[in-house]
From Swiss-Prot:
GO terms for cellular component: membrane; virion membrane. It comes from Human cytomegalovirus (strain AD169). Disulfide bonds: none annotated. The keyword Transmembrane applies. Its main location: virion. Keywords: Glycoprotein, Membrane, Transmembrane, Transmembrane helix, Virion. Glycans are attached at residues 24, 64, 72. This is Protein TRL14. The keyword Glycoprotein applies. It is a single-pass membrane protein. It is found in: Virion membrane. Belongs to the RL11 family. The chain crosses the membrane at residues 143-163.
Length: 186
């Protein structure tokens, strides 16, 4: 399988694969690294259970398990690119040569944007809960009303419950002249 190389349209690209496999028989691997051999060697992508790219200021690229796409190709991007299978050590090597005609080099800093994070709360974890509450059309003061009802019912229950308890007799002190009984019912 030929790696996809996209660059300035006036640049001519010469590439070839150097290994024992045919280009059109490349199978899809998992746990793949794309490596650019230069000084220093640069691991561009790590693929497996995750997708990690190492951005650089002088090369724009995108990768997956089977292809490496280089954007705005310049002579700086020429060299050896390797697709390395981490599980068994198998490698596919690609050599890229860029031949410049009478053209200007492509502009750096024009990499395509893959992911754009949103600053709003539409994609956050609790956004569905917030939307459900907003759609319920419950007035804001309803919680205060329910709290007032609960407190009122509790006070009424306490008042009514206090009348059901049998009253204790009230005792008064008798005059001093009755020595036998000190307390009596009033």
């Amino acid at each position: 399988m030929r790696p996809q190389l996209r660059g300035n349209q006036r640049n001519r690209i010469r590439w070839w694969q150097h290994n024992s496999k045919k280009c059109n028989q490349t199978e899809k691997w998992h746990n793949v690294d794309w490596i650019h051999y230069e000084y220093p060697t640069h691991k561009m992508c790590e693929l497996g259970n995750y997708h990690q790219t190492t951005p650089r200021h002088d090369i724009c690229f995108d990768c997956n398990d089977t292809s490496l796409t280089i954007y705005n190709l310049t002579t700086r991007n020429a060299g050896k690119y390797t697709r390395h299978h981490r599980d068994n050590g198998q490698e596919e090597n690609y050599y890229v040569t860029v031949l410049i005609g009478d053209t200007t080099l492509s502009t750096l800093g024009t990499c395509p944007v893959r992911y754009k994070e949103s600053r709003n709360t539409e994609n956050t974890i609790g956004s569905n809960i917030i939307k459900t509450i907003e759609k319920a059309n419950i007035p804001l003061g309803i919680h205060a009303v329910w709290a007032g009802v609960v407190v009122s019912v509790a006070l009424i229950a306490l008042y009514m419950g206090s009348h059901r308890i049998p009253k204790k007799p009230h005792y008064t002190k008798l005059p001093k002249y009755d020595p036998d009984e000190f307390w009596t019912k009033a």
